[in-house]
Amino acid sequence: MKHILNKDKLFPTELTNIPDPPKEIFIESKNWQDLLDSPKLAVIGSRKASSYGQIVTEKLVRGVVARGVVIVSGLALGIDSLAHNAALGAGGKTIAVLPSGLDEIYPKGHYGLAKQIVKARGALLTEYSPKTVPFKYNFIARNRLISGISQAVLITEAAINSGSLHTANFALEQGKDVLVVPGPITSATSAGCNNLIKNGATPITSADDILEVLNISGNSHVKNQIFAANSAEYQILHSLSDGDLSNDDLHYQSKLDTAVFQQTISYLEITGRIKAVGGNIWTII
């Protein structure tokens, strides 16, 4: 753990320029300087993500991580943990901003995810000293750091009363871009997003839209990397990396049981990772 005062060189300059800047931060990271020098995007949203929210979050995170963008979120249930996991699965880096001390991971079920983030050369960050438990106020205060350390904030799914709207307000106060994924008008979990767009937030429908806002272009920073969120995805994508395969051959090479294979194939097709090209042959997109 590193204890960094706001006058230290390792203190993020982005956080010195926000209203109510923290006087100190505590971090756990093996790669802090590199993270400071990288473009950062906050990705937040509903704690009860729908299948739509899951798909768009993973797709957009993979797209920007491939350009070297670091994903910032709050380690919470739903969109937050999806964003962290998608970044890790894409071979990228991610920062989790906590509402508690570094020794009080919340929720406790995300202790393993927190360790994975650090192991993958990301970071845990908080303004709270060790042994501080996550009081209710801490969550809102934490949100200003999520937006503050990032160049822009992306909300992929949020209801009309979502806590993500606090972060959007902080971002606007800090002069940051608020990017929003539009959702179905029949979906309550996208009502907050659609309302933000009506009020002037930037609608986002692709990773390229985000990269344009961040002024990032060029080739992928993550080369020869299989972007997989879990071992089943990896087995299928790795099997296809040397060429197209029939459904039966792909099933055999992946060594997955039938139910997991079919579920993973369907998900990879829906999310635009693979496609069928006649005769039930699969290819990577």
Model feature map: region roles:
Residues M1-I285:
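Glycine-biased, small-residue-rich flexible motifs in mid-sequence functional cores and linkers
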